[in-house]
Amino acid sequence: SSKTLQSLAELDGKNPTNRKLNVQTWNTAEGAKVLFVEAHELPMFDMRILFAAGSSQDGNTPGLALLTNAMLNEGVPGKDVGQIAAGFEGLGADFSNGAYRDMALVSLRSLSAADKRDAALTLFDQVIGQPTFPADSLARIKNQLLAGFEYQKQNPGKLASIELFKRLYGDHP
């Protein structure tokens, strides 16, 4: 244990190496802001798209952002949830999505070799641009969310968080 402490002591006073990121920014023709960091160290890329579509936008329909976001990868024309998952997996790609208070996001991590990248981007484009919202998935996910809401009613931490936001922001989303 003294060696561990000695090795940590060696770090005292040393500044960590700081890698400068070259962040390029631009706006698309549609007005979306793009932040881009190029790194050739790994043969892969990460892409995240953020939307101002979090739960604060739900209004009188609590859970709308969560439900909509959860349904994105449940189906596209010609593919069900299993085929979508297998498509990403077969390409070595990872699709993820989530909805939070102030935003919703979708992300893709894929190999950058053209054959893998292009196929992963095509599937990603279908998932976020052409979701079919299948009825069976809608019923299943809706039940999961309702069960989650019931659990939250019994969770002191969640109840405290709700009360805090209510006191801080009132009726403001």
PLM segments and residue spans:
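Proteolytic maturation boundary segments
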Residues: 1-48
